[in-house]
């Protein structure tokens, strides 16, 4: 083993792995197909300003001045759900890992696709009616 390999190995051991964060990241990746579907199905060219972002630790949909954002807070090992409208921000939910499942602390329920739909509907109520 070279000196560089030994140094990297020591740094890796020092940094360690956060198994809870790892599982949370894996669960967060389960949102990829949903945000990917939005990116794919929304028109490439539109009369309205919009963007759909699907990163490993941050996902959001923004239409004009309104945004729904889900991101991982790595310090707390939670998923934060926020609504942004103009310069205002409202925290909609904190999602934690409970028994290897995503759990909504505010709603007191297991996270489901229906709850994600509720977040989208609540955020874009002015558009959806």
Can you say where each PLM-predicted feature lies in the sequence?
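Hydrophobic transmembrane signal anchors and adjacent membrane-proximal interface regions, especially
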Residues: 13, 40, 51-53, 63, ...
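Short linear motifs in intrinsically disordered/low-complexity regions
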Residues: 4-6, 58, 100-101
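Ampiphathic alpha-helical segments that act as solvent-exposed interaction surfaces
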Residues: 85-129
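Amphipathic, interaction-prone secondary-structure segments
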Residues: 39-89
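Contiguous, amphipathic alpha-helical segments that mediate oligomerization or scaffolding
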Residues: 2-52
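Residue-identity detector for glycine
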Residues: 16, 36, 57, 65, ...
């Amino acid at each position: 083993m070279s000196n560089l390999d030994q140094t990297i190995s020591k740094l890796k051991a020092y940094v360690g792995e956060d198994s809870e964060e790892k599982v949370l990241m894996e669960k967060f990746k389960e949102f990829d197909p949903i945000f990917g579907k939005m990116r794919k199905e929304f028109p490439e060219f539109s009369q309205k300003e919009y963007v759909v972002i699907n990163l490993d630790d941050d996902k959001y949909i923004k239409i004009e001045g309104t945004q729904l954002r889900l991101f991982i807070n790595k310090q707390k090992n939670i998923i934060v759900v926020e609504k942004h409208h103009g310069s205002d921000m409202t925290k909609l939910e904190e999602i934690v890992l409970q028994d290897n499942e995503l759990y909504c602390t505010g709603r007191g329920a297991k996270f489901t696709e229906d709850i994600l739909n509720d977040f989208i509907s609540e955020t874009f109520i002015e558009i959806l009616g």
